[in-house]
Amino acid sequence: MGSTAILALLLAVLQGVCAEVQLVQSGAEVKKPGESLKISCKGSGYSFTSYWIGWVRQMPGKGLEWMGIIYPGDSDTRYSPSFQGQVTISADKSISTAYLQWSSLKASDTAMYYCAR
């Protein structure tokens, strides 16, 4: 096999490795204060139960705030003190999906929310 073919094969393999891990979040929601909300984050391309999944918030014009993390393998969950009791983080390992949930939204919850591995 020529060096060009080996390089092309190596690049194809590396692109596959880089592209396979994905976290796909549910879409934007419009809700009123007092309503409940559950947003999802579906993982693929890796062992979902072997990595922590974190949630962060970005309020308009502000930086990122760490909310909490979950280890889907055993559902071990840790919250930032600022968010403890305000939200619930959970995971369903059978469908490789993590969740961030509010039982009663406030106007101050208006923000962008992101999951990360």
Swiss-Prot record:
Residues 116-117 are annotated as: Complementarity-determining-3. Residues 70-77 are annotated as: Complementarity-determining-2. It is found in: Secreted; Cell membrane. GO terms for cellular component: extracellular region; immunoglobulin complex; plasma membrane. Gene3D superfamilies: Immunoglobulins. Residues 45-52 are annotated as: Complementarity-determining-1. Residues 1-19 form the signal peptide. Residues 20-117 form the Ig-like domain. Transmembrane segments: none annotated. It comes from the Eukaryota. One of its GO terms (biological process) is immunoglobulin mediated immune response. GO terms for molecular function: antigen binding. Residues 20-44 are annotated as: Framework-1. CDD domains: IgV_H (cd04981). Residues 78-115 are annotated as: Framework-3. Residues 53-69 are annotated as: Framework-2. Disulfide bonds join C41-C115. The keyword Plastid does not apply. Pfam families: V-set. InterPro entries: Ig-like_dom, Ig-like_dom_sf, Ig-like_fold, Ig_V-set, IgHV. Keywords: Adaptive immunity, Cell membrane, Disulfide bond, Immunity, Immunoglobulin, Immunoglobulin domain, Membrane, Secreted, Signal. Immunoglobulins are composed of two identical heavy chains and two identical light chains; disulfide-linked. V region of the variable domain of immunoglobulin heavy chains that participates in the antigen recognition. Immunoglobulins, also known as antibodies, are membrane-bound or secreted glycoproteins produced by B lymphocytes. In the recognition phase of humoral immunity, the membrane-bound immunoglobulins serve as receptors which, upon binding of a specific antigen, trigger the clonal expansion and differentiation of B lymphocytes into immunoglobulins-secreting plasma cells. This is Immunoglobulin heavy variable 5-51.
